[in-house]
């Protein structure tokens, strides 16, 4: 039986003789035209360590596709480095790159009638971009995560890239020596691989195991390790089998499997960006999913992993402790996982977990049983109030001050806020408001890791609030509220905040409130004028014109 269900449209018949001529130039033989064409969407790049180790994974996938009697077709996908672009205009391209990656993969797979696709990616937006494409295409596909970086070390202290961001604030506050500042800088990132805590890349890749679109154990492997290469090869082999069975992403990505994915995100203390990305993935898969669904999952799934940024350990520690399968098995046994959901292997998630022990190993303190959960409820909360009528996203577990009321310190751009923080003009009790940074206003919802890390480095992480219509890095922790909707650019209440206004952030009541009376707000609203777009041409202008609100995933199509 031939499995070239799609590629036959480009390789078969008299009219396709010119096509075959071009394939012969690529080294194809006559019998290859009856084999499935499998795309390898290769995100390798020397822009960032997150993607610098992907070529060997792509090569392994290519070899495995050939060994499975299919034709690999390699094409590139772009990336930017969130970590390097952080705090610059380049960060505005981060979320935009999610859409560009999805569009690139869709374009190549559809334009070439590929029968399946292996997506290989590393940096933060590679994961949602690839999964959005797979959900849109509904062509057999699998995600191969590039793997995590190993932790750095300086004077016996484990480091991640966030250590370097926080060192900026510590150094400028006089709390760190020049030697230690440079030591952290040089040693925070010792290998290839994505940022090591349960930040955005590891959050999304971990959730893909639960979603059923990546192989178990694959998300917590370190990029330099041979097992990561072996996993890439096995992923490609599994994908060819999925092509033969015609097992498609929408057979796997359902409301129930998204609930599984979000449950793992809650259990592991994952990134706020996952809220935005799963709204977009669900939209691409035509699954009914809203921000209220995150709140529903949060209330029933506890945090059972002690992982950075708010915890102690990194992804390699999680891997040694049993990885995501151990987390999944604990959730399954507790009735917090849909065990009947299909995975890319053709087996259910329950079948995949049958050999995983029900109790985590006693010689580790990364993963905890349900009855010893770190927090009884999840950490990613949806806050609402007159400052975020359509919702905002916050991490609320582990806060020493879960309720804060203070004066607004208002900034219409990130650099002004950084100058105020590093210039010691922010005080305990202040609430920073960074606005005009939403999907349309930024545009692109840039992440605010630089200012939040600087605040932490200054020793104000537990005493200063932070509100934005932009995003936060997966490495952010503290009293931070992002994704405020409606955003300032479209006239959301955040645009009406004035310097010194009283604001309340209440993690108990899930409240984000501007303490200004309705009459005054009405007066301000009548006087407000929408600013001119920051960009009038290029990809940022396109994104600003097309992007939906943050509470709808900031999708463009």
UniProtKB/Swiss-Prot annotation:
The modification N6-carboxylysine is found at residue 125. Binds 1 [2Fe-2S] cluster per subunit. This cluster acts as a Lewis acid cofactor. GO terms for biological process: isoleucine biosynthetic process; L-valine biosynthetic process. InterPro entries: DHAD_IlvD/Edd (IPR050165), Dihydro-acid_dehy_C (IPR042096), DihydroxyA_deHydtase (IPR004404), DiOHA_6PGluconate_deHydtase_CS (IPR020558), ILV_EDD_C (IPR056740), ILV_EDD_N (IPR000581), IlvD/EDD_N (IPR037237). GO terms for molecular function: 2 iron, 2 sulfur cluster binding; dihydroxy-acid dehydratase activity; magnesium ion binding. Pathway: Amino-acid biosynthesis; L-isoleucine biosynthesis; L-isoleucine from 2-oxobutanoate: step 3/4; Amino-acid biosynthesis; L-valine biosynthesis; L-valine from pyruvate: step 3/4. Its cofactor is [2Fe-2S] cluster; Mg(2+). Disulfide bonds: none annotated. Keywords: 2Fe-2S, Amino-acid biosynthesis, Branched-chain amino acid biosynthesis, Iron, Iron-sulfur, Lyase, Magnesium, Metal-binding. The active site is at 473 (proton acceptor). Its EC number is 4.2.1.9. It is an enzyme of class 4 (lyase). It comes from the Bacteria. [2Fe-2S] cluster binds at residues 50, 123, 195. Mg(2+) binds at residues 82, 124-125, 447. Signal peptide: none annotated. Belongs to the IlvD/Edd family. Homodimer. NCBIfam families: ilvD, PRK00911.1. This is Dihydroxy-acid dehydratase 2. It comes from Burkholderia lata (strain ATCC 17760 / DSM 23089 / LMG 22485 / NCIMB 9086 / R18194 / 383). The lineage of its organism: Bacteria, Pseudomonadati, Pseudomonadota, Betaproteobacteria, Burkholderiales.
């Amino acid at each position: 039986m031939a499995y070239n269900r799609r590629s036959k449209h480009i390789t078969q018949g008299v009219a396709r003789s010119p096509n075959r001529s071009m394939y012969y130039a690529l080294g194809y033989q006559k019998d290859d035209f009856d084999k499935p064409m499998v795309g390898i969407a290769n995100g390798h790049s020397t822009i960032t360590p997150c993607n610098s180790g992907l070529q060997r994974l792509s090569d392994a996938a290519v070899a495995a596709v050939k060994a499975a009697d299919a034709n690999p077709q390699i094409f590139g996908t772009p990336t930017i480095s969130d970590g390097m672009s952080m705090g610059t205009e380049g960060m505005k391209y981060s979320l935009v790159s999610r859409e560009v990656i999805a569009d690139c993969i869709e374009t190549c797979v559809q334009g070439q009638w590929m029968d399946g696709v292996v997506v290989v990616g590393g940096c933060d937006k590679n994961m949602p971009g690839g999964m959005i494409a797979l959900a849109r295409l509904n062509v057999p596909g699998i995600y191969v995560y590039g793997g995590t970086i190993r932790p750095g070390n300086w004077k016996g202290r484990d480091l991640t890239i966030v250590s370097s961001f926080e060192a900026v604030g510590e150094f400028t506050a006089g709390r760190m020596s020049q030697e230690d500042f440079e030591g952290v800088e040089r040693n925070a990132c010792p290998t290839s691989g994505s940022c090591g805590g349960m930040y955005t890349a590891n959050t999304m890749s971990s959730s893909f195991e639960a979603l059923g679109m990546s192989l178990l154990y694959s998300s917590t492997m370190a990029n330099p390790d041979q097992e990561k290469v072996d996993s890439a090869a096995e992923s490609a082999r599994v994908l060819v089998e999925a092509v033969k069975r015609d097992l498609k992403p929408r057979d796997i990505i359902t409301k129930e499997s998204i609930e599984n994915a979000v449950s793992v995100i809650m259990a592991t203390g994952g990134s706020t960006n996952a809220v935005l990305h799963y709204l977009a993935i669900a939209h691409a898969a035509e699954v009914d999913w809203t921000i209220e669904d995150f709140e529903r999952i949060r209330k029933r799934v506890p945090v059972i992993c002690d992982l950075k940024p708010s915890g102690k350990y990194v992804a390699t520690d999680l891997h040694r402790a049993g990885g995501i399968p151990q987390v999944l098995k604990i959730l399954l046994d507790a009735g917090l996982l849909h065990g009947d959901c299909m995975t890319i292997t053709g087996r259910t998630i329950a079948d995949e977990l049958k050999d995983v022990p029900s109790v985590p190993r006693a010689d580790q303190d990364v993963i905890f049983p349900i009855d010893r959960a770190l927090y009884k409820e999840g950490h990613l909360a949806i806050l609402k109030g007159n400052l975020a009528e359509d919702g905002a996203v916050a991490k609320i577990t582990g806060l020493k001050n879960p309720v804060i009321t203070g004066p607004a310190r208002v900034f219409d751009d990130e650099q002004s806020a950084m100058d105020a923080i590093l210039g010691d003009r922010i005080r305990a009790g202040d609430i920073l408001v960074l606005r005009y940074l939403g999907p349309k206003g930024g545009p692109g919802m840039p992440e605010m890791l630089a200012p939040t890390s600087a605040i932490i480095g200054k020793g104000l992480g537990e005493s200063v609030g932070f509100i934005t219509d932009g995003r936060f890095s997966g490495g952010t922790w503290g009293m931070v509220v992002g994704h405020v909707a409606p955003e300032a650019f479209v006239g959301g209440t955040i645009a009406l905040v004035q310097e010194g206004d009283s604001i309340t952030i209440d993690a108990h009541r899930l409240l984000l409130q501007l303490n200004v009376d309705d009459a005054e707000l009405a007066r301000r609203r009548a006087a407000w004028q929408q600013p001119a777009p920051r960009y009038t041409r290029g990809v940022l202008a396109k994104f600003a014109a097309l992007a939906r609100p943050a509470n709808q995933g900031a999708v463009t199509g």
